[in-house]
Amino acid sequence: MLAKPFMWIILICTATVLASCTGVGRHSEQGFIYKDIQIDTTSASTGQGSTIQFKGNPLPLSGMSIQVGDKLRSVNLAKGDLSLIDVTDTGGSVRLINVVPSLDTTVCEQQTHYLSEKNQGLDQQIKLITISVDTPFAQDRFAKGAEINNVKFLSDFRGGAFGKTHGLLLEGPHVLARAVLVVDGHNVVRHLQVTPDLGHMPDMEKAFQVARSLVNEKG
């Protein structure tokens, strides 16, 4: 059993990191209201020894590093019905994988809405996936409340295996770093961006561009 002071440190760290996205965004009759959130165009490294910033403080990443050209690694994630699926199960499709700390936060919410609503028809050609450590039940509530039907939600709540296997797990708060990956039909990572600052958006348009180029290659 963890000592009480250590448990409190983890709880405080988790609350602090999730505050990086501070408060869930608003919706109107016209749909989701996008906020002016800074977009990072560079990428942090993944894996043990790498860090990302939050309010000027470094947060260490854990796990095995992954980079463009590597293959996505086999790990089981939970679907909405709690059944498991291997993240490498591509079905031969190009996939855009949206990785967020928690859907119950503004930046994460906006990042996922952007994936769903701004992909300009890519959802008809590739698979859109969002991975977080939220429980499958929380992901399902989010998807229904946000009326997002074109994104598959997968949960890494069972110990953060996806994060550890791909160097995207934040050690202290035990949430995933903010990232976007484009993976081809052979499970090769063709694009990877990890936001250097946890409170910033990734460059989703760049990810869309890479995914579209892979679709054109197949065509």
Regions found by a protein language model. Give the residues of each.
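Short clusters of small/polar residues that mark proteolytic maturation junctions
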Residues: N76, T88-D89, V194
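Short loop/turn motifs at secondary-structure junctions and domain boundaries
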Residues: I66-G69, H166, E171-H174
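Short active-site neighborhood of thiol/selenol oxidoreductases, capturing the structured segment around
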Residues: I85-L115
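N-terminal targeting signals for export/organelle localization
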Residues: L2-W8, V17-S74
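Thiol-/selenol-based redox modules, centered on thioredoxin-like
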Residues: A177-G219
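Short, small/polar residue-rich loop motifs at catalytic or cofactor-binding pockets
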Residues: K71, V94, V175-A177
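Structural microenvironment flanking redox-active thiols in thiol-disulfide oxidoreductases
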Residues: E109-I148, F153, G160-F162
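Residue-level recognition of short loop/turn positions
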Residues: D81-S83, H186
